[in-house]
Amino acid sequence: MKSYIELKDLEITTNIGTYQAGEVVPSAHILDLRLTISPRYVFIDEDLMERVFDYDPLIAKISKTASNGHYETQERLITKIAFLCAENEEVIAADIYLRKFPVSPETGTLGVRLKIDQDDLQALKT
């Protein structure tokens, strides 16, 4: 049995990149997050919050981190998100996908994905 928490299409407020006059400036940055967690937090015997992984604090930390200052690259923000995921003992592995839109006039997305397996995430926790 495997279980995941999946967050899709979260538009985050952030300031990424430096653009010159005439360059396309993205209007949105979108985050997808897939967290592998123990099935014991999903396959539960009672309908109680203390039986599940409370992801709201993690989302709040991600939003705060994303909006706190300027980033030159999506990669740096993804790295910070990876460390935030590692702060949660319930998270076993993570798949983080951050993309921006548009990348050419009115079209296209460009994204960066980081997949962190159990061993790599454990290394971030220490």
Segments and roles (model prediction):
Residues M1-T126:
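N-terminal, polar/charged subdomain of small-to-medium soluble alpha/beta proteins
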